[in-house]
Amino acid sequence: MLINRNLIVLDLEAKCKTEVIKKMIDLAYKEDRIISKEDFLKCVLEREEEISTGVGNGIAIPHGKSETVKEALIVFAKLKNGIDWESMDSEKVDLIFLLGVPERNKENLHLKILAQLSRKLMDEDFVKLLRNSSTEEEVYYILRSIEAS
């Protein structure tokens, strides 16, 4: 399962995108979804250097494909205060979806997940539900619809 309640954090406080990504990777590590925090962080930050994953509308989708990822995952964070993510629209980011996919995955699973997620994020009502949610449980049920689509 891509999403679980323990991979959701609300009101995350961070000063920069690297700090956000580190905190999100910590969650994945605590849930035993990745083997090495350092290796996965390096992978995600290298991808981020290629081109920012700030997709606009206050949303970022950092991601990485790495042998340190045990099984595909999504970590979700809603920030207490938006931060600069070098987004296409220059808006501060407050909703982050960190995707991780095992390197050995040959079906381009990360592209399929990105496509599903992108479709959902084009729905303003879906994004509004996420922004207005106040509990991890609420967010969990909203995000489950990604796997169903």
Region spans (language model):
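Cytosolic covalent-transfer regions centered on His/Cys nucleophiles
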Residues: 1-149
